[in-house]
Structure formats: C-alpha cells, structure tokens
Amino acid sequence: MFSRNAASSRAIPVEKMIEQVEKNPVIPIHWGKAQKGMQAYEVLDWETAKLCECTWLLARRDVIKNVRLMLGCGLHKQIANRLLEPWMWITVIVTGNEGAWNNFFALRCHHEAEPHIQKIAGMAREVRSQSIPQKLSA
C-alpha cells in the first residue's frame, strides 16, 4: 500500500503559479493518434505533433490571460489556480513497502501504460534501484 501527499495549488499565490507555468510548463511527451481503445499506439507525424504542441502552449497563454481577468474581478486563488493545473508540475511524496512498489512498477512501467505515467514510473524505478535504505532508530 502507498501513502502519498501532493503539494496543493490552493496554497500557492497565483502570480507565482503563473510564473512557474510560463517558465517551465508541462508539455506532453507523446502525441498519440486518435484511435479506438485506451492506448494510442501510433503517434502523430512530427509536423502535426509540433502543431499540437504550439496549440497546447497557445491554450496556456489564453488561460493565463483569463486567470488574470478573473483575479481582477476578485476571484480567490483556489479557483484561479485550478485553471493553470494542466501546465504545472507538482511535488508528490510517496512511500510504500516493497510489494506496493513492485506492483506499481509492473503496472506503470508496462509498455501499455499511459506514456506520461510510464516515463515517471521509469524514473522512479531508476532512483529506487540506486537507493540504499537505512534503518532509522526510534
């Protein structure tokens, strides 16, 4: 079983969030073609993928503009920040026993896993393989 916690966008000032989203936005690493089923086995050609990436970033620009408009109306950050979430990175702390991690890696490092979680799971597996656990005294 995992125990996890993630940083809350509700706690971050909107302008700080906007700055993060402008400087280092999340951009998809896999632009899959539309097809039946849960997996996009085929990817868009390079030119179409670049067009999608540009459109993704234009959507970010439009959302930032609209967030600032709503802030001008007095909207609280807990709502305004929600609109920025598709482009933001978050910090998550996860703990689990060996069985939980082995199960997670079996499912999420699998070739049919969603590409973005597959990438993150692979990175976590690599870090875990290099970790040397230390028993702490009470």
Predicted regions and their residues:
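A conserved ligand/cofactor-binding region detector
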Residues: 1-138
